[in-house]
């Protein structure tokens, strides 16, 4: 089965940008860099800022890499799919959410719903908190303490239906 381009995960550890998932590039086996990825890989500013602020001068003590999920409003449709976290977990990499302010309740919902997510970095976390979370993650501990409001199941289902194009009238009926 051919995967959609949006499900492909590439490494951001070096300029080669090797494919990590679903089909790993051969050169990944010989790479000495830790595997880090941002998914979906469409926000160049997030990618550059994340690499420079949180990944440089860090050492991952774990044998598997990390997928940092761009949990922002432009990607909302992806996160109403019940299988997105399971699909990324098939890569064997740790999943960490990078949540913007508007999707914090949905990110908190997924932290509670999925045991595949190792942590969450909020947009308003200060530098010290971000560094502490990265240290916890890179030493094999969780950084999944949630903060703020959380969607409940009913709110999630309503959001999913709105995103799929169902009107309020259709939902009520």
In which residue ranges do the predicted regions lie?
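N-terminal regulatory/sensing modules of transcriptional regulators
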Residues: 1-141
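Helix-turn-helix DNA-binding segment
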Residues: 144-173
């Amino acid at each position: 089965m051919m995967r959609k381009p949006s499900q492909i995960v590439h490494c951001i550890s070096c300029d080669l940008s090797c494919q990590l998932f679903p089909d790993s590039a051969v050169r990944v086996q010989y790479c000495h860099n830790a595997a880090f990825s941002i998914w979906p890989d469409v926000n160049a500013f997030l990618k550059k800022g994340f690499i420079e602020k949180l990944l440089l001068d860090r050492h991952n003590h774990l044998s598997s890499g990390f997928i940092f999920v761009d949990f922002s409003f432009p990607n909302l449709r992806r996160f109403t799919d019940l299988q997105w976290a399971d699909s990324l977990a098939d890569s064997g990499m740790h999943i960490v959410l990078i949540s913007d302010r508007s999707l914090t309740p949905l990110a908190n919902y997924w932290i509670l719903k999925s045991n595949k997510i190792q942590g969450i970095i909020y947009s308003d976390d200060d530098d010290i908190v971000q560094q502490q979370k990265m240290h916890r993650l890179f030493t094999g501990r969780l950084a999944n303490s949630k903060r703020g409001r959380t969607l409940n199941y009913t709110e999630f289902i309503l959001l999913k239906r709105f995103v799929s194009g169902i009107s309020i009238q259709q939902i009520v009926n």
